[in-house]
């Protein structure tokens, strides 16, 4: 056997093996590698999108939280203002009610003073009539002398 023939036959067998591999096996391997590369690229892109969405969600949540705090502060300020308005209104109403009560009490006092004066006038008129009757030693008829009593009462006023 000759080394040249063995070497040539092995070269031919290797060439057939390379042709078979490139024709039938290699396209499937390349397709599988490309699919895996595509899946890896898609996974990385999804990871990047997820990271960006997480950052956006974090920013949105901080904005919403900031807005909620601001709104809560506004509500507290409005509530405090409303409370002070209610207190001021209650004070004003109490003042008005107190003034009404005071005016009513003053009117009642004036009425009582007037009633007491009127009662005193009548008593003084009665005493004057009794005194006059004792002085004259005769009884004065109150009905007959009503005009006289009315004029005395008017003078006392």
From Swiss-Prot:
Keywords for this protein: ATP synthesis, Cell inner membrane, Cell membrane, CF(0), Hydrogen ion transport, Ion transport, Membrane, Transmembrane, Transmembrane helix, Transport
Bilayer topology: Single-pass membrane protein
Top-rank taxon, per record: Bacteria
Any one annotated GO CC term: plasma membrane
InterPro entries: ATP_synth_B-like_membr_sf, ATP_synth_b/b'su_bac/chlpt, ATP_synth_F0_bsu_bac, ATP_synthase_B_chain
UniProt keyword Zinc, yes or no: no
Pfam families (alphabetical): ATP-synt_B
Subcellular location: Cell inner membrane
Gene3D superfamilies cross-referenced by the UniProt entry: 6.10.250.1580
Major location category of this protein: membrane
One annotated GO molecular function: proton-transporting ATPase activity, rotational mechanism
Transmembrane segments annotated in the record for this chain: 7-29
Protein task: F(1)F(0) ATP synthase produces ATP from ADP in the presence of a proton or sodium gradient. F-type ATPases consist of two structural domains, F(1) containing the extramembraneous catalytic core and F(0) containing the membrane proton channel, linked together by a central stalk and a peripheral stalk. During catalysis, ATP synthesis in the catalytic domain of F(1) is coupled via a rotary mechanism of the central stalk subunits to proton translocation.
Subunit structure, as described in the record: F-type ATPases have 2 components, F(1) - the catalytic core - and F(0) - the membrane proton channel. F(1) has five subunits: alpha(3), beta(3), gamma(1), delta(1), epsilon(1). F(0) has three main subunits: a(1), b(2) and c(10-14). The alpha and beta chains form an alternating ring which encloses part of the gamma chain. F(1) is attached to F(0) by a central stalk formed by the gamma and epsilon chains, while a peripheral stalk is formed by the delta and b chains.
Protein family (similarity comment): Belongs to the ATPase B chain family.
HAMAP family per record: ATP_synth_b_bprime
Listed name of the protein: ATP synthase subunit b
Gene: atpF
């Amino acid at each position: 056997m000759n080394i040249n023939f063995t070497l040539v036959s092995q070269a031919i067998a290797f060439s057939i093996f390379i042709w078979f591999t490139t024709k039938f096996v290699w396209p499937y391997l390349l397709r599988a590698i490309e699919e895996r590369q595509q899946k890896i690229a898609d996974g990385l892109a999804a990871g990047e999108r997820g990271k960006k969405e997480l950052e956006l969600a974090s920013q949105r949540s901080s904005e919403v939280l900031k807005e909620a705090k601001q709104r809560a502060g506004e509500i507290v300020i409005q509530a405090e203002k409303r409370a002070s308005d209610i207190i001021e209104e209650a004070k004003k109403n109490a003042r008005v009610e107190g003034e009404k009560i005071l005016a009513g009490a003053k009117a009642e006092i004036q009425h009582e003073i007037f009633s007491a004066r009127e009662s005193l006038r009548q008593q003084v008129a009665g005493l004057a009539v009794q005194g006059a009757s004792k002085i004259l030693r005769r009884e004065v008829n109150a009905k007959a002398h009503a005009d006289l009593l009315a004029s005395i009462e008017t003078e006392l006023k």
